Amino acid sequence: MRNISIIGAGQAGLQLGIGLLNAGYHVSLYSRYSAKEILNGSILSSPSMFNDSLECERKLNLNYWDTVCPKNKTVTYTLSQSNKTEIALRWQGNTIHPYQAIDQRLKFSCWIEEFIQLGGQLIIQDVHIKDLSYIARQQELTIVTSGKGEISQLFPINETRTIFDKPQRVLCCLYVKDMLSVAYSQGVRANVIPGIGEYFITPGLTLTGTCEMML
């Protein structure tokens, strides 16, 4: 078996595709967007990657940003008193190894270019369930790594692992520069305000340099 298709050009699909190319396989990668479209698109998330995940990237020489990305070392949790501005509880933990938060537009666009340079075939297509049979017939193995869009319906919720059947939050994400530093924290800060919501701040790296990722 030497010819493989991967559907989804995200964290899993790109690493798998590049790893398979390095091992001598012929790989076709299906992506809804090109590298340029991803780079110029909207924020995808506020991702924190911890050491085990970062080591997987390093083994594939995909750790392009190790020297420029903030090295986060703590996780701080703060709970406010209900209907008040005073702090009710705060605790902080230290990680054994630094962790990173890199804008996925930067990461995925660079990884797609690396995939192409290694000889991979990038196919720009929004794959639907009806397309899978045709794609599977063209290759010896087809792997789905996408969890978004129609194709996610292939994977029903595992009710033994979750009691929820819909999102529990309405999310807003933005990146800001030149935010005032906080002396007590060198990493993500999770703030809970009862009755209002949650607010996460993570030092990270975006297209224009270091930033604070707010969720």
Task: Identify the residue ranges that each predicted region occupies.
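Well-ordered mid-protein domain cores that form the structural environment of catalytic cofactors
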Residues: 94-115
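Short, glycine/charged-enriched secondary-structure capping and boundary segments
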Residues: 20, 43-44, 156-160
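Glycine-rich FAD pyrophosphate-binding loop
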Residues: 5-9, 18-42
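N-terminal FAD cofactor-binding segment of flavoenzymes
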Residues: 37-82
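Predominantly flavin-linked oxidoreductase catalytic cores and closely associated redox partners
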Residues: 110-215
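Charged, glycine/proline-rich intrinsically disordered loops and linkers
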Residues: 71-73, 78-95, 183-191
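N-terminal Rossmann-fold NAD(P) dinucleotide-binding loop
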Residues: 13-14
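Residue-level detector of anion-binding/catalytic polar loops
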Residues: 26-27, 63, 121, 141
